[in-house]
């Protein structure tokens, strides 16, 4: 018997495609003549994400912000972060954050989740022309800067500025500390836990860029930054 292959659309992130469809004025994604119909839950998740990013309204109409997001050839989350970066410093930082999130964490063995640590090391290595393990991330960051018309910045980033930009990309992952040591409640629902020794555990508010979670269980944070 021939092996059945699962069509990519059945498991892929549909947010970029849903934004493109909204850009063309189509309001009912379900009515399109799909070769393989994407799961309704995936369509719903994509729409919910785009609404939370301010890219579309609840009727699937593209917004002015959505048009700016759609103009950038990257995931809507990263595009929103770059578009909302309203200074040259923030735009350069947004490009570095996007590159860091696109690649495997160079400090994956480090238990601390602080993104600012990674970004500082990237910038110091780049400034000294000693890229080493940061070479791939530095290259991707340069591509993002070209896309965003940003300039390279190798000053140490402000931690709360990192958090602000992460929050633009992941608004549902803004998290407030709860009564448990190192515990937080996500804006989009669900709980996450930091190690008590994590440098971010002293902050009341954080923005989470990378995590692993399952329904009904406390999520594990990999990358985050503090918020004011």
Provide a role label for each language-model segment:
Residues 1-228:
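Second RecA-like catalytic domain
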């Amino acid at each position: 018997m021939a092996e059945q292959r699962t069509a990519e659309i059945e498991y892929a992130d549909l947010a970029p495609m849903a934004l493109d469809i909204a850009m063309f004025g189509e309001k009912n994604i379900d009515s399109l003549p799909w070769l393989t119909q994407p799961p309704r839950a995936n369509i719903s998740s994509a729409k919910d994400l785009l609404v939370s990013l301010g890219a579309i309204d609840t009727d699937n109409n593209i917004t002015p912000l959505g048009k700016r997001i759609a103009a950038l050839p990257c995931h809507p989350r990263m595009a929103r972060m770059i578009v909302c970066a309203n200074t040259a410093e923030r735009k350069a930082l947004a490009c570095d954050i996007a590159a860091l999130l696109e690649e495997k964490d160079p400090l994956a063995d480090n238990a601390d989740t602080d993104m600012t640590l990674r970004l500082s090391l990237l910038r110091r290595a780049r400034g000294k022309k000693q890229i080493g393990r940061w070479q791939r991330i530095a290259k991707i960051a340069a591509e993002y800067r070209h896309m965003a018309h940003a300039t390279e910045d190798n000053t140490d980033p402000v931690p709360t500025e990192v958090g602000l930009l992460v929050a633009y990309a992941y608004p549902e992952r803004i998290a407030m500390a709860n009564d448990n040591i190192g515990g937080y409640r996500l804006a989009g629902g669900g709980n996450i836990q930091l190690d008590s020794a994590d440098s971010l555990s002293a902050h009341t508010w954080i923005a989470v860029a990378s995590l692993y979670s399952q329904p009904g269980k406390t999520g594990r944070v990999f990358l985050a930054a503090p918020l004011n």
